[in-house]
């Protein structure tokens, strides 16, 4: 794939406001940053860039539409043939973009490979603001854990969701003046989209009845790429389908679908694979499910929020560790 490194047609408005570059690359980043992006556009001269890390329509563009963000000004098309090439492309494309548009600051969120755009910003002496900083699961085998450590250390301002995260940052030796506990933006995002979530007709479209199906989402490397975990997880899913005798709707990422097909693993006939859904439809499925089984990082926040407004659902986190210990408190 020919990556894009010429951004001569991209520029800030130069309206006297501070110039802020926001870089995203995956669905969780788009969701969590959606309310923040809207506020930033009011106070800063903003450019929103997408690395292309999730290149499927249902993994990015549908969320820009659902969350009323408009499409990004920049698509980097940075996905390579393998992990090393993708990471290199993200840093290279980010570097080229920053040298051509000269932002006053970079805003990133989380622990994805797209966050490694911070490496380019650091070399160019561009201040880095990192949301969701300080998360740790203490499992060095997870690629996200490496990204977290790198980005936390090189960021100029780390915005943590919790006291747990703040303490982890302090353990890394980061000074207090570079760390702020801001809380998570997810409650604001969900609250502002609640009407659309509740009015979704996705159950009718799929022929499902409230509390008569299980919703499944499994996409992390630890569950999909590790053979032992993969077999264990989907064997358990088949047993779940047999025990409860109800449909299991699997919101299946393209990479996960390919892995299942290549493995030859036979899913129970009650497990229904479906392409990833939009933000409103997926959350409507969550609040109406008999149970939600997921390895998504947003599950603890979503289940907590919906419980607080009488839309509770049993949430089962299929992780060997979590970077959000506050969800277990």
Please give the residue ranges for each predicted region.
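A nucleotide-sugar donor-handling region in carbohydrate enzymes
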Residues: 2-9, 53-58, 77, 154-228
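N-terminal subdomain of nucleotide-sugar transferases
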Residues: 2-53
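Glycine-rich phosphate-binding loop signature in dinucleotide/nucleotide-binding domains
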Residues: 15-16, 97-104, 208-209, 288
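Active-site and donor-binding regions of nucleotide-sugar-utilizing enzymes
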Residues: 19-24, 29-36, 43, 63, ...
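Structural beta-sheet core signal
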Residues: 22, 48-50, 108, 130, ...
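Donor-nucleotide binding loops and adjacent catalytic segments primarily
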Residues: 53, 61, 197-288
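N-terminal beta-loop-helix "entrance" segment that forms/cooperates
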Residues: 54-70
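A donor-sugar binding/catalytic signature common to diverse glycosyltransferases
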Residues: 108-109, 115-118, 130-131, 158, ...
């Amino acid at each position: 794939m020919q990556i894009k490194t010429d951004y001569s047609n991209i520029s800030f408005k130069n309206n006297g406001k501070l110039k802020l570059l926001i870089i995203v690359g995956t669905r969780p980043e788009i969701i969590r940053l959606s309310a923040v992006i809207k506020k930033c556009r009011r106070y800063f001269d903003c450019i929103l860039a997408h690395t292309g890390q999730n290149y499927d329509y249902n993994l990015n563009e549908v969320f820009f539409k659902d969350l009323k963000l408009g499409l990004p000004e920049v698509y980097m098309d940075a996905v390579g043939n393998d992990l090393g090439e993708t990471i290199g492309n993200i840093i290279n494309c980010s570097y080229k973009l920053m040298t051509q548009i000269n932002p006053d600051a970079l805003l990133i969120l989380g622990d994805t490979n797209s966050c490694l755009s911070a490496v380019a910003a650091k070399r160019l002496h561009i201040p880095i603001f990192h949301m969701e900083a300080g998360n740790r699961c203490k499992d060095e085998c997870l690629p996200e854990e490496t990204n977290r450590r790198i980005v936390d250390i090189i960021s100029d301002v780390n915005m943590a969701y919790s006291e747990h995260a703040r303490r982890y940052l302090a353990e890394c030796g980061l000074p207090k003046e570079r760390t702020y506990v801001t809380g998570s933006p997810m409650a604001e995002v969900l609250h502002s989209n609640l009407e659309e979530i509740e009015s979704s007709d996705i159950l009718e479209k799929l022929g499902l009845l409230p509390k008569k199906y299980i919703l499944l989402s499994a996409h992390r490397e630890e569950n999909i790429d590790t053979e032992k975990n993969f077999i264990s997880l989907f064997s358990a899913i088949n047993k779940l389908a047999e025990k409860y005798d109800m449909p299991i709707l699997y919101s299946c990422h393209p990479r996960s679908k390919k892995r299942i097909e290549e493995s030859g693993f036979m899913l129970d006939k009650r497990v229904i694979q479906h392409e990833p859904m939009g933000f409103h439809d997926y959350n409507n499925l969550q609040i109406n499910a008999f149970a939600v089984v997921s390895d998504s990082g947003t599950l603890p926040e979503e289940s907590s929020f919906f419980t607080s407004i009488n839309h509770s659902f049993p949430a089962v986190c299929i992780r060997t560790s979590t970077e959000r210990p506050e969800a277990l408190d």
